[in-house]
Amino acid sequence: MIVVKKAIAALGIGAVAVSVSSINASALEKGTVTASALNIRSGPSSDCDKVAKLYKGKTVEILEKSNGWYKVRVSSSVVGWGSAKYISTSGSSEGTSNQNNPTSSGTTISGNGKVNVSSRLNVRSGAGTNYSLVGKANNGDVVKLLEQSNGWYKIKLSNGVTGWASSQYISKTSEDVGTNNSSNSNSTNNSDKKPSSEESIEGKNGKVTSAVSLNVRSGPGTSYSIIGKLNGGDVVELKSKNNGWYKVKLSSGTIGWVSASYISETNEGTKEKPNSSSNQNSQSNSNSKPSFTGNSDKSTAKGSTIVDFAYTLIGIPYQWGASGPDKFDCSGFTQYVFKHSVGVSIPRVSREQANFGSAISMGNYAPGDLVYFDTDGDGTTNHVGIYVGNSKFIHCSGTQTNPNKVKVDNLTSSYWSKVLLGARRFV
């Protein structure tokens, strides 16, 4: 028989821990989103419809708990369910001021964990993103596990630093602490210096699978400087591999490092980049606009930030006049992305956005540029999106009578190539 004892705080009576499918949470309990973007759904299941999207650091009121899901209040009018794995509750922060002692809300654990991230993992003073950074761990580092609390591990690094890190990026391992650890080593920007764990893989090629431009860096990690870019479909020569990064040789002869997450080994040969001079025709005469047939991407760091953020919104439904975060129209989507990704404020309506910033000639589009269209055939702008590279753009598609959603389309398609008017750059 399952017995649930109600905790009566006024009498100080403790509750016996029991397993129940669903319990009510205190209306005062708060949670903080720990994922970069978290879908909020109509019910406690990933099969339920999305009703909103929340971003890292957002604080919500927790109304109910059920089988690994939290029912949360997003706004005065929106309530939905989010995975508890990506919501850190306020209760998990109690007692974390002294990092050498177990927290009152954490469960003591033992063993070691291995860091699994594409870049570096933040280590914080408490179990939540609202706590200050006390260190960083690199991909492949092995750390000592001390406690577990609401999707966070309390860990001890090889240099003695103790703090909290998201358990999403740590897997339990039998390896010893300090294995592959580089948290305390001096970083280098010299890509010719071979890391100790580098594995030679001469004679193989790799193909870029990223939907957006892929950064090429001077070393195996995001802390290294960007020395080039690759587009989806590019084939490069693989030289070696180190902790989730490939050392590659580009067709231009440049040697650098790229994340292995976006490279698949291939039998295809490397190619010289096609001369893009055929695409350099300016749109000085809007009445004789050529169809879009391709582009030479010249990405920037801010452009990549814009595109990466826009991709987190894919699938959000169209609603005429909406500007987010749970519904958009086309210009509401672009305005929201520029504001929340790089802090740039642009006009609200599409025709004004098409006159904002700097005009970019066809063939010179870069990821993060605004692209604008005339879908009515009257010569004026009535639709906008954001160029993501590789001749593709992301936009909130739909009309007032035929709503759609945020998605990616190809500018070289028979339809979009004919209605494209141009591009503008805001950063």
From Swiss-Prot:
Q: Which Gene Ontology BP terms does the record give?
A: proteolysis
Q: Which residues catalyse the reaction?
A: 330, 383, 395
> What EC number(s) does the entry state?
3.4.-.-
- The keyword 4Fe-4S is assigned to this record: no
Q: Where is this region: Disordered?
A: 89-115, 174-206, 267-299
Question: Where does the record locate the signal sequence feature?
Answer: 1-27
**What does a knockout show?**
The deletion mutant exhibits significantly delayed cell autolysis and increased cell viability compared to the wild-type strain. Deletion of the gene impairs toxin A (TcdA) and toxin B (TcdB) release due to the decreased cell autolysis in the stationary/late phase of cell growth. Mutation also significantly decreases sporulation, increases spores germination and increases cell length. In vivo, the defect of Cwl0971 decreases fitness over the parent strain in a mouse infection model.
Tell me which PROSITE patterns the record gives: NLPC_P60 (PS51935), SH3B (PS51781)
List the InterPro entries.
Answer: NLP_P60_dom (IPR000064), Papain-like_cys_pep_sf (IPR038765), Peptidase_C40 (IPR051202), SH3-like_bac-type (IPR003646), SH3-like_dom_sf (IPR036028)
The Basic and acidic residues compositionally biased stretches are: 191-205
Q: Where is the SH3b domain?
A: 28-91, 110-174, 203-267
**Keywords of the record:** Hydrolase, Protease, Repeat, Signal, Thiol protease
Pfam families to which the protein is assigned, alphabetical:
NLPC_P60 (PF00877), SH3_3 (PF08239)
Asked if the record carries the keyword Cell cycle, the reply is no
Comp. bias intervals (Low complexity): 179-190, 275-291
Q: Name one GO molecular function term.
A: cysteine-type peptidase activity
Q: What induces it?
A: Transcription peaks at 5 hours of bacterial growth, followed by a reduction, and reaches the lowest expression level at 12 hours of bacterial growth.
Where do the NlpC/P60 domain residues begin and end?
A: 300-427
The UniProt family comment states: Belongs to the peptidase C40 family.
Q: What further fact does the record state?
A: Could be an attractive target for C.difficile infection therapeutics and prophylactics.
Per its database record, what is this protein's job? Peptidoglycan hydrolase involved in cell wall lysis and cell viability, which affects toxin release, sporulation, germination and pathogenicity. In vitro, exhibits hydrolase activity for B.subtilis cell wall.
Check the record and name the PANTHER family matching this protein.
Answer: MUREIN DD-ENDOPEPTIDASE MEPH-RELATED
- Protein name listed in UniProt: Peptidoglycan hydrolase Cwl0971
